[in-house]
């Protein structure tokens, strides 16, 4: 991953629409290892476009910076200051956000340490 000092990330990246009401801004990415860090922003009332849980092939860490996020399958809501660490293969979601949320997310390939 590229090294940066403090800066305004919007000078290097923009918000990209993932699905209605859900946007991502990639802060840094290593295309060789698959590792990346990003911000994900959900508008109030946003929900996953799928009704099935997500399963990734990478390790995912999520910190809720502000707002709320509800796991619809578990019927459990998570709030500002909460953190998740998910190993590859862990089912989670689908999600909805009543008031909207902003999350800091990192994705790490399970074999990135071998390179």
Region spans (language model):
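Glycine- and acidic-residue-biased ligand/ion/polar-headgroup-sensing regions
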Residues: 50-72
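A short, N-terminal "cap"/entry segment at the start of jelly-roll beta-barrel domains
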Residues: 1-36
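Conserved catalytic motifs of the protein kinase core domain
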Residues: 35, 60, 100
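Ligand-binding loop in jelly-roll beta-barrel domains
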Residues: 88-113
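Conserved short histidine dyad/triad with adjacent acidic residue
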Residues: 26-56, 75, 87-91
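Short, well-ordered beta-strand segments in beta-rich or mixed alpha/beta enzyme
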Residues: 40-42, 63-69, 103-105
């Amino acid at each position: 991953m590229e090294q940066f000092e403090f800066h305004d990330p919007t000078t290097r990246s923009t918000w990209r629409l993932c699905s209605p009401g859900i946007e991502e801004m990639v802060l840094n990415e290593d295309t060789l290892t698959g590792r990346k860090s990003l911000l994900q922003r959900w508008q109030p009332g946003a929900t996953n476009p799928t009704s099935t849980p997500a399963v990734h092939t990478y390790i995912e860490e999520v910190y809720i910076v502000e707002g709320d996020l509800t796991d619809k399958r578990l019927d459990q809501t998570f709030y500002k200051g909460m953190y998740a660490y998910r190993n590859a293969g862990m089912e989670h979601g689908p999600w909805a956000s009543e008031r909207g949320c902003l999350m800091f997310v990192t994705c790490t390939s399970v074999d990135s340490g071998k390179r």
